[in-house]
């Protein structure tokens, strides 16, 4: 080991700048998916410097009406920015801080024995290119906390239907229209990591195609071909297919997406095998058409195969950056028309006439290709084959301007295109397919093209019938667009190499796990510069667009400026024409550092508010806040802090201080002008009411003494016949009194409280009667004055209207003298109150209620108190009606209070039999 000494330090420092640094890329699990770089690319496409990106992962679910789990397939937009292929995860990217956070579900111990466990936070941090890992339960809190600290920034989600769990209050700040186009533009250009995965998927699929070619003469059914292909893919750790394999033999090849794969191969000429696997979520798409024998079964099959192969090779030769893909599609149609004219299938017209009529779409109904990546028909497909529609629209051939891939349009009347169509230009880093084909669909020909006079005149039926058994031919490869041309990622054999494998039965010795480092590709000479380049491609070196990094830190690290990168825009129309150039990551870092260095120092807080919190709740350092410890200190703090310091005052604090001052003024003024509140009865007022009641009892007793002298003495002198007539007259008098006082019955309420205890709530009626439980039964005696029981007290309040009734004026009261008349008037008032009590008790009898309340086993029913059953069996036996009344006691009593008198005298209700009045009646005595 070399000993470090101070003498050699200067020499080492002098040669330090000349040292060479070695960069290594590991082909091991340490080669992480570049999620952090993808997030930065999305931020650059969005063109924002602050905000939050939220993406949910695919949740785990079961099949419908089943307890078996459905096949899990991660959401591709989520995977592009996270690299995580686990269910029930979430992703959050803080743009300003450049922090990528992954939320994973917490491990459930009860499910580990069944499904295994997921990643722990430490494992996820080491596995994925992310900065932080939290459990999913913390998602709502973290996002709400971020939103509170960033009041004026937006949150970007993928779709308008997307929702952040527990964050519905943030909907006004959510942008659901900008994120998906930005990620789609980024996904169109693949980086080195993505290209490696697509190449790996192509290698595995190509080997599976070789195995099928080597064993095709052994199989007798389409299902066997599909099974062998999937067997090879699964054995190479590619357990998922990018799409359902298409193993179409004979006429089935005329169906573009045939997937039954269950018919026998006997009597068929060709098989069209369209199949490709996924590797780490990246797809491959390969199609090969081959004979089911060692040689071509017919001349017609060989002719169609050679025509399709010429279409594909011609289009592939012209793949390079800046080429408009739609032009290649039109060129493929022109080659197909020339070939079909030469074979005699098309006739009676020139290439231009058939081209304008769109008859070639009968044999080539789909587009030339599509993007491929995380999806087999990856994002950007619409841009690749799109048509920019202008105002002048003319009828054109539908075969020239397809709107959707594999969306057949069989009539020219259903498709229109502008005179100046525009589509996407190819860019470096794109991976596209080139898949021309010639098909003979009997259904499409019979129902759309042959009945149409526009197309039928160009089709030779006699020759067409000979080519119908061919079914269809399609050849498809996956190609990477490079700076100098293209690279074919598909290594599956075709042409003569394909026939050699079928004849020999040997798939070859291609090693899948270690593919060739230099796959077949078409390269330009090095001394020839490319004509058109995508933005950001260097003129000097062919370095990749993105370089995989280690796990990203919370803040971006210092990166070196690369002077050999220019950003010259593409010449001519392009997908990026008219767009301003997005800033690179290095420029973003420099801009962030400048802003960080230019931030002024935060002013110190007031000394008296050292440990206080601002009024507005936001502790920002660029403005001066108002602090408060108590409510009384608010005005003084606001006056002292507004004019102090050179920094600007916090607007929110000023608004809150002014609002509180106005509230104080309004409260102070309202206390002077507000009406006098209702006072609660005091002990002295209750004593006064008891004094008035005692005086009323004395008056009633005096009236009873007079009855002893007059009425009582006369009762001993009259006979039985007169006593009966008097009872009838008294009953008539009682009926008149009851009819006269019926209109005020609704103003009386009965309330039962213990003796000496005032009612809990003041009555809103004019009169209120309180009654002791278990009153003594008082028997009237002829020579004894009738004194009302002591437990009957009358609580009077100021009436809202006069209780005088004209019917009370003609009751026939005797007037012996002025004193007797006054006493009689007082007696009459007491008698009216007693009649009112009797009327109220009659109402209880009408409702079928027997109110027997005993002093030791009685509860006061309240609205908020449940009715309890007494433990006394005798009380329970004699109080059945009270038990029924208990559950709704308050409602029934309020119903009696508010029930008008007319409801008791309705004609449909039978009259109660009249009660014979006798002076000793117990009911009247009570």
Swiss-Prot record:
The keyword 4Fe-4S does not apply. Mn(2+) 1 binds at residues 285, 435, 476. InterPro entries: Aminopep_P_N, Creatin/AminoP/Spt16_N, Creatinase/aminopeptidase-like, Pept_M24, Peptidase_M24B_aminopep-P_CS, X-Pro_dipept-like. Binds 2 manganese ions per subunit. Residues 505-538, 595-615, 668-696, 711-741, 865-926 are annotated as: Disordered. Disulfide bonds: none annotated. GO terms for molecular function: manganese ion binding; metalloaminopeptidase activity. SMART domains: AMP_N. The keyword Hydrolase applies. Mn(2+) 2 binds at residues 274, 285, 476. PROSITE patterns: PROLINE_PEPTIDASE (PS00491). Residues 506-515, 887-897 have a biased composition (Polar residues). GO terms for biological process: proteolysis. Pfam families: AMP_N, Peptidase_M24. Its cofactor is Mn(2+). Keywords: Aminopeptidase, Hydrolase, Manganese, Metal-binding, Metalloprotease, Protease. Belongs to the peptidase M24B family. Catalyzes the removal of a penultimate prolyl residue from the N-termini of peptides. This is Probable Xaa-Pro aminopeptidase PTT_10145. It comes from Pyrenophora teres f. teres (strain 0-1) (Barley net blotch fungus).
């Amino acid at each position: 080991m070399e000993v470090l000494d101070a003498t050699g330090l200067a020499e080492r420092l002098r040669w330090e700048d000349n040292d060479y640094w070695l960069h290594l890329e590991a082909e091991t699990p340490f080669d992480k998916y570049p999620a952090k770089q993808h997030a930065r690319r999305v931020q650059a496409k969005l063109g924002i410097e602050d905000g939050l990106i939220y993406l949910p992962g695919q949740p785990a679910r079961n099949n419908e009406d089943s307890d078996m789990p459905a096949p899990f397939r991660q959401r591709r937009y989520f995977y592009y920015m996270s690299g995580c292929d686990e269910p029930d995860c979430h992703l959050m990217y803080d743009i300003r801080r450049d922090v990528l956070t992954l939320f994973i579900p917490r491990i459930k111990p009860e499910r580990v024995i069944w499904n295994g466990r997921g990643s722990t936070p430490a494992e996820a941090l080491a596995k994925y290119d992310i900065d932080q890992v939290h459990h999913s339960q913390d998602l709502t809190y973290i996002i709400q906390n971020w939103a509170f600290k960033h009041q004026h920034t937006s949150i970007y989600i993928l779709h308008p239907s997307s929702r952040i769990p527990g964050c519905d209050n943030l909907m006004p700040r959510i942008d659901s229209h900008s994120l998906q186009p930005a990620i789609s533009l980024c996904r169109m250009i693949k980086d080195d990591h993505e290209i490696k995965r697509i190449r790996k998927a192509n290698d595995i699929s190509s080997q599976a195609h070789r195995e099928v070619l080597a064993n095709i003469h052994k199989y007798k059914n389409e299902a066997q071909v599909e099974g062998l292909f999937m067997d090879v893919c699964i054995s190479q750790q590619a357990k998922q297919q990018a799409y359902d394999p298409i193993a179409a033999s004979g006429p089935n090849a005329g169906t573009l997406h045939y997937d039954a794969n269950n018919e026998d191969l006997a009597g068929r000429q060709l098989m069209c095998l369209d199949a490709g696997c996924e590797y780490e979520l990246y797809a491959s798409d390969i199609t090969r058409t081959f004979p089911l024998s060692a040689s071509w079964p017919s001349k017609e099959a060989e002719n169609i195969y050679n025509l399709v192969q010429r279409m594909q090779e011609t289009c592939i030769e012209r793949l390079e950056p800046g080429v408009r893909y739609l032009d290649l599609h039109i060129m493929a149609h022109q080659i197909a028309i020339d070939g079909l004219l030469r074979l005699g299938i098309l006739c009676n017209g020139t290439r231009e006439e058939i081209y304008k009529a769109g008859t070639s779409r009968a044999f080539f109904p789909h587009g030339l290709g599509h993007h491929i990546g995380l999806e087999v028909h990856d994002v950007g497909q619409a841009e690749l084959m799109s048509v920019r529609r202008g105002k002048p629209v003319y009828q054109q051939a539908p075969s020239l301007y397809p709107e959707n891939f594999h969306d057949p349009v069989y009539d020219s009347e259903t498709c229109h295109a502008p005179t100046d169509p525009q589509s996407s230009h190819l860019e470096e880093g794109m991976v596209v397919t080139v898949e021309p084909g010639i098909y003979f669909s009997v259904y499409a020909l019979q129902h759309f093209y042959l009945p149409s006079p526009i197309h039928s005149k160009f089709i030779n039926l006699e020759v067409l019938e000979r080519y119908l058994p061919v079914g269809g031919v399609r050849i498809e490869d996956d190609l990477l667009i490079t700076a100098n041309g293209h690279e074919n990622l598909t290594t599956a054999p075709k042409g003569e190499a394909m026939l050699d494998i079928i004849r020999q039965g040997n798939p070859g010795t291609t090693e899948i796990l270690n593919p060739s480092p230099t796959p077949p590709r078409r390269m330009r000479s090095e001394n020839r510069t490319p004509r058109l380049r995508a933005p950001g491609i260097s003129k000097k070196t062919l370095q990749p667009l993105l370089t995989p990094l280690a796990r990203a830190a919370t803040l971006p690290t210092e990166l070196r400026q690369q002077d050999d990168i220019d950003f010259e825009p593409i010449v001519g129309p392009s997908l990026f024409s008219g767009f301003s150039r997005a800033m690179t990551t290095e420029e973003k870092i420099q801009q962030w550092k400048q802003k960080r260095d230019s931030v002024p120092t935060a002013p110190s807080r007031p000394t008296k508010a050292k440990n206080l919190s601002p009024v507005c709740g936001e502790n920002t350092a660029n403005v001066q806040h108002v602090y408060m410890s108590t409510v009384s200190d608010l005005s003084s703090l606001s006056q002292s802090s507004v004019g102090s310091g050179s920094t600007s005052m916090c607007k929110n604090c000023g608004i809150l201080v002014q609002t509180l001052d106005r509230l104080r003024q309004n409260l102070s003024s309202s206390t002077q002008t507000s009406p006098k509140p209702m006072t609660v009865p005091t002990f002295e007022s209750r004593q006064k009411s008891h004094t008035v009641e005692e005086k009323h009892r004395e008056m009633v007793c005096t009236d009873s003494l007079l009855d002893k002298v007059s009425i009582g003495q006369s009762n001993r002198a009259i006979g039985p016949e007169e006593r009966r007539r008097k009872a009838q007259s008294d009953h008539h008098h009682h009926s008149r009194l009851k009819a006269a006082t019926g209109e005020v019955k609704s103003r009386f309420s009965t309330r039962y409280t213990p003796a000496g205890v005032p009612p809990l709530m003041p009555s809103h009626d004019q009169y209120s009667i309180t009654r002791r439980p278990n009153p003594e039964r008082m028997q009237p005696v002829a020579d004894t004055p009738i004194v009302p029981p002591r437990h009957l007290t009358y609580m009077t309040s100021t009436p809202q209207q006069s209780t005088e009734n004209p019917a009370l004026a003609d009751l026939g009261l005797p007037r012996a003298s002025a004193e007797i008349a006054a006493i009689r008037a007082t007696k009459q008032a007491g008698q009216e109150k007693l009649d009112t009590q009797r009327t109220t008790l009659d109402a209880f009898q009408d409702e079928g209620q027997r109110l027997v309340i005993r002093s030791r086993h009685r509860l006061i029913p309240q609205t908020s108190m449940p009715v309890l059953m007494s433990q006394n069996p005798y009380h329970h036996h004699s109080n059945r009606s009270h038990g029924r009344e208990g559950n709704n006691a308050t409602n029934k009593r309020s119903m009696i209070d508010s029930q008008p008198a007319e409801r008791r005298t309705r004609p449909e209700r039978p009259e109660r039999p009249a009660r014979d009045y006798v002076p000793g009646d117990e009911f009247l005595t009570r």
